[in-house]
Amino acid sequence: MPNENIGFIGLGLMGSAMVSRLQDLDYQVTVCANKSRPNIEAAIARGAHEVETACALAQTSDIILLCMDTSASVEARMRGPDGVIAGLQKGAIVIDFGTSLPASTRALGQEVAAAGGYYLDAPLGRTPQHALIGQLNI
């Protein structure tokens, strides 16, 4: 089993496929609660651990993966007392797989760096089916 603690926020079509692939490779994944339950429940059924807030996820994750639809969604999960930045461990890596706005990405990168972490912008290419077999373009 790999040693990194992976936190994942955003289990839509692409995110849930990415989590499934990580679980296929024996990564321990922590997922953040969401109102939409089917993909969260599927990840939990395969061994994922669920936490209520992005802050709690960050407190136990070496690598935090974000797969959300808009910059506003990313910012909402990153900032505030329940956000990733509030719980970020020193040296943690945050990777945003969305197509976020450049100004938002730069601002979050600075905030994560100030908290002792690293922020990577890594938009995805291809489909959820490619994610399931580990063939995304990142």
Task: Please tell me what each predicted stretch does.
Residues 21-24, 45-46, 78-82, 108-112, ...:
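Short, glycine/charged-enriched secondary-structure capping and boundary segments
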Residues 6, 99-138:
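Rossmann-fold dinucleotide-binding core
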Residues 37, 73, 127:
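Active-site loop signature of alpha/beta-hydrolase-fold enzymes
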Residues 7-15, 47, 80-83, 87, ...:
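Glycine-centered flexibility sites
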Residues 1-66, 131:
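NAD(P)+-binding Rossmann beta1-loop-alpha1 motif at the extreme N-terminus of oxidoreductases
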Residues 54-66, 70-118:
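Rossmann-fold NAD(P) dinucleotide-binding segment
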Residues 30, 51, 94-95, 120, ...:
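Structural detector of well-ordered beta-strand residues that form the stable sheet scaffold
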